[in-house]
Amino acid sequence: MVVVAPAQSPAAGAPKVLLLSGQPAATGGAPAGRALPVMVPGQQGASPEGASGVPPQARKRQRLTHLSPEEKALRRKLKNRVAAQTARDRKKARMSELEQQVVDLEEENQKLLLENQLLREKTHGLVVENQELRQRLGMDALVTEEEAETKGNGAGLVAGSAESAALRLRAPLQQVQAQLSPLQNISPWTLMALTLQTLSLTSCWAFCSTWTQSCSSDVLPQSLPAWSSSQKWTQKDPVPYRPPLLHPWGRHQPSWKPLMN
């Protein structure tokens, strides 16, 4: 039987006392009907110490020397039940939080899919407008690499816009024809004179190059015999080497000092 008894302390935040009545064991020495006191801490916010802001002192651990082994086992079992219930509550709160996160992520995914679909439709409209502008300018519609890749996937994504296409195709065909018209107005006589002048220049250049090669080939064999003859003459008549004059050792030398007996 569990009995809740108020604490003797007049404070509102004092701990409560639970009295657990245990049955007598066969081998235990505890009397029948003995109550097991269990201290349950009260709310800390209602205590005067918590209201004043002073940190509470560490409560000394209560010695259980006055309890029998059965009472100790019952007290340990109660504490284990409280810890298990706390763990279950914490797990339940965590699971509910994860479920809420999953719901939020699914909603965000749906929003992103809708936005992606709108962008695809807008891109398709820009592609159609680009093709119409190309047809108005008299040019064939060009298929980009992005179109080739998206056709395999079944999507119509295309990189670019109508403005870039208009900038690339700004020059019409009339301007191209106006640029080519000066070349068409040149007379054939002028073209013939230009070709003859070019041919004469090339022939003169070829003649000069062959003439310089022939002159260099004629001068080289004539210079070779003279160089070889001069080399042979230097080898046959070398300059004789004269040894330096050495004067005999005598009194005329400044360092003359004979040994005197």
Swiss-Prot record:
Lineage: Eukaryota, Metazoa, Chordata, Craniata, Vertebrata
Segments passing through the bilayer: 186-203
PTM (free text): Isoform 1 is ubiquitinated, leading to proteasome-mediated degradation in response to ER stress.
Keyword check for Phosphoprotein: yes
Recorded GO CC terms: cytoplasm; endoplasmic reticulum; endoplasmic reticulum membrane; nucleus
Organism of this sequence: Bos taurus
Function summary: Functions as a transcription factor during endoplasmic reticulum (ER) stress by regulating the unfolded protein response (UPR). Required for cardiac myogenesis and hepatogenesis during embryonic development, and the development of secretory tissues such as exocrine pancreas and salivary gland. Involved in terminal differentiation of B lymphocytes to plasma cells and production of immunoglobulins. Modulates the cellular response to ER stress in a PIK3R-dependent manner. Binds to the cis-acting X box present in the promoter regions of major histocompatibility complex class II genes.
GO BP terms, alphabetized: adipose tissue development; angiogenesis; apoptotic process; cell differentiation; cellular response to amino acid stimulus; cellular response to fluid shear stress; cellular response to glucose starvation; cellular response to interleukin-4
Region (Nuclear localization signal (NLS)) residue spans: 76-92
Segments on the Lumenal side according to the record's topology features: 204-261
Family label: Belongs to the bZIP family.
Gene3D superfamilies per record: 1.20.5.170
Chain positions with Phosphoserine modification: 47, 68
Name of the gene this protein is made from: XBP1
Name the UniProt record assigns to this protein: X-box-binding protein 1
